[in-house]
């Protein structure tokens, strides 16, 4: 595998990591249509666990099939495919080596009342399935946040020791946070920084709004005149929180939205210096050809062609 100069520069930021871990990061960064550019688009399909099968897949019945998602990610030229244990097991043989995979090792479900996730996969599962990385969600702000942080600390240490990369979903929720707080700029930047501090190689956060939720933080933003006037500027600030861009930061697509709204958001991500997108429901809930066209346009935006 030839590694581009851009990707080599990114890998240089991970100064403590082994050649094995860097090789797995390189596999993700060099794969697909964006390979070598430093930008990535990943398909995540953990929504069946999070929201249930009907809410996730009834809009496109083909999406009940785990093979559908592997093939969609491959045909779209994406960098990687992320999913829980059973989804990856169901296609691991057929698609072995076809696309880098990320095993989501913890999961929540919509039947629970507390903001927490169960550990549902292991580092050994990821190795057995040929994955390049493990994925783990933390909920900064939740009553269970410290337990989640301790879990990922142990899992990350084990993953790195065997050459796997660590992808962290950092989603503020629970505790004192209201809905506005979950996507407030100061909170999103804080969540991104926590993931970096916990040792994530790739950090996934939600696109921030212009809300400043913590009064103490709001006072600092105003005193220091931090520019939060546009979405691109807010994205830039979140990336800054990940060690001034020394860690890969990607943003979620969230609930399904109209095409133009999605493209506008992706342009802001690109202009703000994001490394890319992890986008699920906005793609696999559409008919296959429509999803492929949408993903191609997103890739072209990151390439600067649209």
Protein language model features and the residues they cover:
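Catalytic or ion-translocation cores adjacent to nucleophile or general acid/base/metal-coordination motifs
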Residues: 290-306
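Conserved residues at beta->alpha junctions
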Residues: 253
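A C-terminal functional module that forms or caps the active site or interfaces directly
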Residues: 256
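N-terminal basic, low-complexity leaders that serve as flexible interaction/assembly modules and, when applicable
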Residues: 1-45
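Alpha/beta enzyme core
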Residues: 1-2, 35, 40-42, 47-81, ...
